[in-house]
Amino acid sequence: MGSDFDVDQFCGLLAHAAPDAVIYADHEGMIRFWNAGAQRIFGFREAEAIGKSLDIIIPENLRARYWAGFNETMRTGKTRYGNGDILAVPALRQDGARISVEFTVLPFHDEARQMVGIAAILRDVTKRFEEMRARAANSRNFAAAD
């Protein structure tokens, strides 16, 4: 790449165009960035998601546990999932369908090293999880037939 390569422009284009969901939420859990991948996976257009709580993609039965972890991360500045570790969890689409997503998070700090938000990169793995469940069920059925 030539000397006229603009890293900031590249990063912006990459974040917007990535096929995976890229979501940034501020310290209160309000969505501030939502890319085309997030729209494809979750169904909400950018204008529908920006300014909303992350609750729009978190199944209701998991919200208390999620927010406890989120608030702990905001308080301490540390997360168990910020070192490239991938977490698989259920998520919610706009139409109410539950999907399976894998994600990793990137904590964001200000100049004073205070947490200001978290970015997450998410991938829909619903099809893979369904195939794994079907294979496991087939294996159980095969073993029971023996």
Residue ranges of model-derived segments:
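PAS-associated C-terminal cap
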Residues: M1-D8, R123-A137, F142-D146
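Sensory modules in modular signal-transduction proteins
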Residues: D4-F33, G37-Q39, N83, A144-D146
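PAS/PAS-like sensory domain cap-loop motif
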Residues: G37-A49, E111-A112
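PAS/LOV-family and closely related PAS-like sensory domains
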Residues: E46, I58-V101
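PAS-family sensory domains and close relatives that share small-molecule sensor folds
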Residues: R93-D95, T104-D110, I121
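Charged alpha-helical signal-transmission linkers that cap and connect PAS-family sensory domains
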Residues: H109-A112, F129-E130
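PAS-family sensory domains
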Residues: Q114-D124
